[in-house]
Amino acid sequence: MPAPSVVEAILRIDRAAFGDEWMMDQQTFREALHATQRARIFVSHDDGELTGFVIAGVTDSYGFIQRLAVHPDFQRHGVAGSLVQNSLSWIHSRGCRSTVVNTEVSNDAALSIYEKNGFVPLDYNLLVMERQLSV
């Protein structure tokens, strides 16, 4: 687990990148790190400031890009592509032959990054559903 100051910086970037609807909290962050047999966080910096991160994980044969976020001030500067490339190199070094990622169908920026890094859409229909609960 990274130092608390790094976790806070990662969560700040995540909030800035995703807003309230999809943002991670500390519990979700821990779950992402423990969702696979082994996970690693790659970060990017600019003048000592954390600008983006990716959480990558591996199982026996598959790699996963579990979370990718870049602060809006640093988007469209190659940060996300570099983070994806670093995570793919690490996943490959762990012996995985395939890597999976998911993103919103309407997220053109993410789709472009993943396609530039060799990802292709799979023929899956995934429906996200929600039920409001009274508090």
What are these regions (language model features)?
Residues 1-10:
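A short beta-loop-alpha structural element at the N-terminal edge
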Residues 58, 71-73, 77, 105-106:
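Active-site acidic-Proline motif in GNAT/NAT acetyltransferases
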Residues 101-111, 128-133:
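Conserved beta-strand-loop-alpha-helix junction that forms the acyl-donor binding cleft
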Residues 91-103, 125:
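Conserved GNAT acetyl-CoA-binding A-motif
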Residues 70, 76-89, 93, 112-116:
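Conserved acetyl-CoA-binding loop-helix of GNAT-fold acetyltransferases
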Residues 12-24:
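Helix-loop element at the rim of GNAT/NAT acetyltransferase active sites that forms part
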Residues 115-124:
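Conserved acetyl-CoA-binding loop of GNAT-fold acetyltransferases
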Residues 28-47, 51-69:
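A conserved beta-strand-loop-helix scaffold within acyl/acetyltransferase catalytic domains
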